[in-house]
Amino acid sequence: MTQAVKLASRVFHRVQLPSQLGSDSVLRSLSDIPGPSTPSFLAELFCKGGLSRLHELQVHGAARYGPIWSGSFGTLRTVYVADPALVEQLLRQESHCPERCSFSSWSEHRRRHQRACGLLTADGEEWQRLRSLLAPLLLRPQAAAGYAGTLDSVVSDLVRRLRRQRGRGSGLPDLVLDVAGEFYKFGLEGIGAVLLGSRLGCLEAEVPPDTETFIEAVGSVFVSTLLTMAMPSWLHRLIPGPWARLCRDWDQMFAFAQKHVEQREGEAAVRNQGKPEEDLPTGHHLTHFLFREKVSVQSIVGNVTELLLAGVDTVSNTLSWALYELSRHPEVQSALHSEITGAVNPGSYAHLQATALSQLPLLKAVIKEVLRLYPVVPGNSRVPDRDICVGNYVIPQDTLVSLCHYATSRDPAQFREPNSFNPARWLGEGPAPHPFASLPFGFGKRSCIGRRLAELELQMALAQILTHFEVLPEPGALPVKPMTRTVLVPERSIHLQFVDR
């Protein structure tokens, strides 16, 4: 990502104006955008716990400076946009290959350790090529629905594991400690089955050591990412800990993915030995498809590693928050349980999950409301490849623009009682919000490629869990707030009771 900010005095000769901008509107420059001073901005980040409160800083910034403001960190100036209409205006001006703020430390790891970039770290034409390969297998609803049978057995194993974990270390017979940890295992098992076509053992009574190492690395890499991104690169030599930790985490994840990809490659070679290409069997997992497309092993490993990471956090955090909120709103849980049991035959989940469950309005509304309150990625970004206009401001080419999705999804102008869990708001109760107010999966070409798969996993998991259990809060537990760890996570462990129905 180019980090240089263009001078405010530049001539605006390549500005793309929005159609709604009136001819009498006055264009203003980057230097006219309000925002905190650099010392104040840095104090908020490093002296007041701002790195773990980045989502809250979005809300505070919008309240203090309005829908658009800017802040500087060294030579890098970031423009923050916290109004859904302005977010839409910016995203509608995307180029053929939209560029977002790259996780520079991730890209640097790939370069130094000679690893291939996957869909999360690739840019430009390489990103476009990978996206074009993977999108038909993940983004089309019918393609995602094809994994229902695979995921059904994973969800059934999750239910069995929750039964085993009840009462362990808690003194309460139905209490499961740290449900997010259990759902991390579920998320990895599910995405692993889709990507690799094999089970990883995450939900067994004894989890394989390399799987435990991978799960720990996923949690650790987001913490080290925040630290390394906040530090200038020259500081990595003086304070080597965060960078060394990030490299260790990524190396462990790459080793895990490489081991399983090579196993699939070896199995395919034995199975297909001596057969002409037209007679080779078709596989249903993504690694098989990438091999057939003659993608290099190094590139397959890079993509599998990054997709495993993305799949784990999206499902585990959203499922944790969903059951947390449902446990605190028993009337919603009861209504959802009735909707599920009234529409689905528990004996035929694998056949009905992708069809019947996706048509249940309250189930979809619960997931949508959870993602509004707790978007996995609280903010997104774009780096325009030309001068663009956002509101009445000209944003120069190569300026980092942060889209404050957490702030827009809790905007009282868009959502009545925005901090309250109310799935009914998505069922026609009250005025409809701006369509860009809540964008948990992003928008356009850079939208989350695993959206359909994540929604399917969440629907299937909630359906089976609520069919088997009534979920209750931990007795006497205080409310749990979110915190930023690159992604949005619970600030402390969530413990829940799973009572047999």
From Swiss-Prot:
Gene Ontology biological-process annotations: bone mineralization; calcitriol biosynthetic process from calciol; calcium ion homeostasis; calcium ion transport; decidualization; G1 to G0 transition; lactation; negative regulation of bone trabecula formation
Gene Ontology molecular function terms on file: calcidiol 1-monooxygenase activity; heme binding; iron ion binding; secalciferol 1-monooxygenase activity
Subcellular locations according to the entry: Mitochondrion membrane
Main localization of the protein described in the UniProt heading: mitochondrion
A GO cellular component entry from the record: mitochondrial membrane
Cofactor dependence: heme
Binding site for heme: C448
The organism's place on the tree of life at top rank: Eukaryota
Keywords for the protein's UniProt record, in alphabetical order: Heme, Iron, Lipid metabolism, Membrane, Metal-binding, Mitochondrion, Monooxygenase, Oxidoreductase, Transit peptide
Pfam (any one): p450
CDD domains in UniProt: CYP27B1
EC numbers for this chain: 1.14.15.18
Organs and tissues of expression: Kidney.
Enzyme class label: oxidoreductase
Catalytic activity: calcidiol + 2 reduced [adrenodoxin] + O2 + 2 H(+) = calcitriol + 2 oxidized [adrenodoxin] + H2O; secalciferol + 2 reduced [adrenodoxin] + O2 + 2 H(+) = calcitetrol + 2 oxidized [adrenodoxin] + H2O
Pathway per the UniProt entry: Hormone biosynthesis; cholecalciferol biosynthesis
Disulfide bonds: none
Described function: Catalyzes the conversion of 25-hydroxyvitamin D3 (25(OH)D3) to 1-alpha,25-dihydroxyvitamin D3 (1alpha,25(OH)(2)D3), and of 24,25-dihydroxyvitamin D3 (24,25(OH)(2)D3) to 1-alpha,24,25-trihydroxyvitamin D3 (1alpha,24,25(OH)(3)D3). Is also active with 25-hydroxy-24-oxo-vitamin D3. Plays an important role in normal bone growth, calcium metabolism, and tissue differentiation.
Sequence similarity: Belongs to the cytochrome P450 family.
Full protein name: 25-hydroxyvitamin D-1 alpha hydroxylase, mitochondrial
Protein species of origin: Rattus norvegicus (Rat)
Lineage: Eukaryota, Metazoa, Chordata, Craniata, Vertebrata
Gene that produces this protein: Cyp27b1
